[in-house]
Amino acid sequence: MKKRYIACVAAIVVGIILVSWGTAHKGIKPVTWDRTTNRLVVLKKVRHTTKLADFDRLVVNTKLPVVVKPGSVNQVTVQQQAANRRRHPVTTKVHDGTLTVSGGDQRQRGVTLNGLAITGDDEAFDTDGAITITVPQSDQLKVLTLQKSWTVRLEDLTVQRVTGRTGGNFQAKNVQFKKALDLSQGDADIYLTNVTAPKVTAKTSYGDIQVRQSQFKSTANVLNSLDGDITLEMTELGGGDLRTSDGDITVRDNQVAKTLTVQSYEGDLSGMVPATAGVSVQGSTDSDIELFGRSRGATARVRPHAKVQYRFITGDDGDITVR
């Protein structure tokens, strides 16, 4: 009890000191211990913008979130907390038409005070960290290479191809990919909205995959997540394979030219398909299967000779609902 009392008193004293320090530096603001300078510093955002030479290839080698979008000129804007900028500076270099963005880290170690709250965390995050890259609307990226990436978002662009390993999050909105979109390496959540590509291959171990309002003409498209959920909505595609182990899969209001296979070993499957499409379902004796409003057994099939076919397959623990 005595030790606990001493610890509480010590924490209160430290809190009072930190509050006083923060108040003396322009009011009560979040502060952290900067291990670079070994002193308390006020957490504040800093931003700097650099104009760039022309480039048509981009290498992302940073754990800070990166957004690539159209602008009037080639430039990069980096925003970080001041302490993190000193510890993890971001570098940008254009060489032979390739822009490489390196450095930067969201991690910040130390004690943080926000008001009267004191937190200590070896893996806290610089939530202000971000990198924004703009390219002229008339230009297109030939190659986007992901080396050490965490969050990458593409907006309103034309990109020939993507290579490398996805990190925590990959997003593309209003993007045309000239070549097959290969996102088969990594553990990222993948979000594609209004994306066009000849083919998409998206694979992730733990992330979710969401594809909406997009177009992929290939009949061999692949969306595959080991533990995440998969959603495919309002998308035009030749066909393909959607597969997950533990996650759920939802397909709704898509235009499929040939065959779409939807399979989960332990998750639930939900589909909204055209009234003229053929549908086959395969579950287990423990599965609840509903096909166009009617309860079915472990296997069922309607319109087997239709041009467009949907195949729903689930394992012992999964249910299937098709409307």
At which residue positions do the language-model features occur?
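Short linear S-[DN]-x-LW-Φ motif typified by the pepsin-like aspartic protease active-site region
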Residues: 27-106, 110, 126-147, 151-165, ...
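Generic beta-strand structural signal
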Residues: 94-96, 185, 204, 264
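Glycine- and aspartate-rich repeat motifs characteristic of hemolysin/RTX-like Ca2+-binding segments
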Residues: 143-145, 151, 160-163, 169, ...
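N-terminal Lys/Arg-rich, disordered targeting/topogenic segments
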Residues: 1-3
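Hydrophobic membrane-insertion alpha-helices, especially the h-region
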Residues: 5-24
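A mature extracytoplasmic/lumenal domain signature
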Residues: 62-64, 72, 82, 103-105, ...
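Acidic/polar low-complexity surface segments
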Residues: 112-124, 294-302
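Short, surface-exposed interaction patches in beta-rich subdomains
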Residues: 192-194, 198-204, 208-323
